[in-house]
Design a protein with these regions (language model features):
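Bacterial Sec-dependent N-terminal signal peptides
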Residues: 1-21, 452, 513, 527-530
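An edge-strand/N-cap motif at the start of beta-rich repeat modules
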Residues: 18-50, 63-65, 94-96, 141-143
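Blade-edge motifs of beta-propeller repeat domains
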Residues: 19-33, 60-81, 109-127, 158-178, ...
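Gly/Ser/Thr/Pro-enriched helix-cap/hinge segments flanking short amphipathic alpha-helices
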Residues: 23-27, 322-457
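Beta-propeller blade termini
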Residues: 31-42, 83-92, 129-139, 180-190, ...
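Glycine-aliphatic tripeptides that mark coil-to-beta-strand junctions in extracellular
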Residues: 42-46, 94-98, 141-147, 192-198, ...
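Short glycine/acidic-enriched loop and turn motifs that connect beta-strands
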Residues: 55, 105, 152, 202-205, ...
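C-terminal outer-membrane/trafficking sorting elements
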Residues: 385-390, 415, 421-423, 454-536
Length: 536
């Protein structure tokens, strides 16, 4: 291994929180196809990743700003990541594994316990890969994988808990001739389970109808694009989802790859199970760039989510309007490659270094215990004097590259954080007060010692007891927009969803004792109740 130092020229910092930022390009020092930024060794720092069929090059970021280079020769991969790459620690050994999505199939590169060797695992199935993701599809605490298929129904790989992945096709993106291009996993309906949007492309209109697969909370999904007003037959390869108006739910930017079938879409989440296209009021009707790459970060740390589409930054104003910048940072992966709290990029062998400003920031590195070790699927909300922001942990955004698994928040000129709330996929909720700003915090699931038993109350009523098929809940009129979570006696989450008409279908539960927790969509300690119940 060799130690490398990268230097860049910093511009003078600005004094106000709405300033756009500039960027300085420099060599990335990569030898192969650069595929993004991701923490490869579990130290919380983003590293530079470059791969070929027979080599994996990692430039490990150090605390002093230098990089230690490692090049590992691998068994020749049957499939190269010619279409996409995803990364995560799917076998929970502390080292990041890779998924190569190619034109003929899928290869997994499984890291050993110190990242010095990789085991090449390639299936025999034909997959014309597009976007790929690591995600816990069945929420059993183990990361699965998903790959969009261009010409057939999409495929996924279920983790058996020992790091072995079983291939499945169909059920999540089923159009017979495919057209599945850009998958992103998100919780759009605030019921605390993970849904999936697929940006689609194709010759005939039906093949390119965008899809939203809604998690039913029981391991199944229902494609609901039409009822949500998201089934659009524009040509698109990827989308970018964030809370662009800071109202507590995720909105969607669906970027057009060509204008032959329609313009860009900016879909406002109405909070009632529908979306409305607000592109005409967004300030983006003059944005005539088309691209296959769309992602979202807060590049200037002003506290609002921005969009990067085709390399052009669209600065968010926090109200679903945007300012088109003259900055183009290329299509690639994103992360903080010099630990200064500002988002950088990698594209075509160059690091695109953010020259920063005076705004403050916070980063969270999630470490799952009951949930998957990377915390993928977790939602993080922070509250400051300026309001509440939310982010989600995702593996595989945009179309082709891999970006950081750390969640990044710009704070503007706010000097304090009132609270940080992490909703883990397991159902565990961590709440922290007064975390230090301008710092990366590595948070272990359950670290805040906030658990379900703490909230057992005498004023939450359920009947009948024992319950057979349905459980009715009462005395929750003080909880706004209630969400229910059911845990078994070991503390494992077994059900979750929005509470509708004070009724929960428990027919699928096995007989035994359970804990029911009711909380508001915006979690507060004084806004949660829990009780035990019996299923017969």
């Amino acid at each position: 291994m060799k130690k490398l130092f990268f230097f860049t020229c910093l511009l003078a910092a600005v004094q106000y929180n709405s300033a756009q930022v500039t960027f300085t390009p420099q060599s990335a020092g990569t030898n192969y196809t650069d595929r993004g930024f991701v923490d490869m060794n579990g130290d919380g720092l983003d590293d530079i990743l470059s791969v070929s069929n027979s080599n994996i090059q990692v430039l490990y970021q150090q605390q002093d700003g230098s990089f230690v280079e490692s090049i590992v020769s691998t068994t020749f991969a049957d499939i190269s990541p010619s279409w996409s790459l995803a990364a995560a620690d799917y076998d929970r050994n502390g080292q990041t594994d890779l998924l190569y999505g190619g034109g003929n199939g899928v290869t997994f590169m499984r890291a050993n316990d110190d990242g010095t060797q990789y085991t090449e695992i390639s299936g025999t199935e034909y997959v014309f890969s597009q976007r790929s993701n690591f995600v816990d599809i069945n929420n059993d605490g183990h990361l699965d994988a998903y790959v969009c298929h261009d010409v057939e129904p999409s495929v996924f790989y279920i983790n058996d808990g020992e790091g072995n992945l079983e291939y499945f096709q169909g059920g999540l993106g089923d159009y017979p001739s495919g057209g599945h291009y850009g998958s992103v996993w998100l919780d759009f309906d605030n019921d605390r389970d993970i849904d999936m949007f697929i940006a689609k492309c194709g010759g005939e209109s039906e093949r390119r109808d965008n899809e939203m697969h809604v998690n039913n909370g029981d391991g199944t999904f229902t494609e609901s694009g039409a009822s949500l007003n998201l089934e659009d037959d524009m040509q698109t390869w990827s989308s970018a989802w964030a809370d662009y108006d800071n109202d507590g739910d995720l909105d969607g930017w669906v970027g057009a790859s060509t204008f032959n079938s329609g313009f860009h879409r900016l879909m406002r989440n109405n909070g009632n199970g529908t979306f409305t296209d607000v592109i005409n009021a967004s300030g983006l009707t003059g944005f005539n760039v088309t691209s296959i790459e769309n992602q979202t970060y807060d590049f200037d740390n002003h506290g609002n989510a921005d969009i990067v589409s085709g390399g052009v930054i669209l600065y968010g104003n926090g109200d679903l309007t945007f300012t088109i910048s003259s900055t183009n940072i290329g299509n690639g992966g994103f992360g903080d490659i010099n630990e200064d709290g500002f988002v950088d990029a990698i594209s075509n062998g160059q690091l695109i270094i953010n020259n920063t400003n005076n705004n403050n920031w916070l980063k969270i590195n999630t470490i799952g215990v009951e949930s998957n070790i990377d915390g993928i699927g977790a939602r993080i909300e922070i509250t400051t004097a300026s309001g509440t922001q939310l982010r989600e942990v995702r593996s595989g955004e945009g179309f082709r590259n891999m970006s950081t698994l750390n969640t990044h928040f710009g704070l503007g000129l706010d000097q304090e954080i009132e609270s940080v709330t992490i909703y883990w996929p397991s159902g565990i909720i961590d709440v922290f007060d007064d975390l230090e700003i301008n710092t990366t915090h590595s948070i272990v699931e359950g670290q805040s010692a906030l658990n379900t038993g703490e909230f057992l109350t005498s004023d939450l009523s359920v009947f009948p007891v024992p319950a057979l098929n349905n459980l009715t809940v009462s005395n929750i009129q003080d909880i706004e927009d209630p969400v229910y979570t059911v845990f078994d006696v070991s503390g494992r989450k077994v059900m979750q969803g929005r509470l509708l008409n004070n009724n929960i279908d428990v027919s699928q539960l096995t007989s035994g004792q359970y804990i029911l927790r009711i909380s508001g969509q915006k979690f507060r300690r004084n806004n949660v109740k829990a009780t035990k119940f019996t299923k017969r």
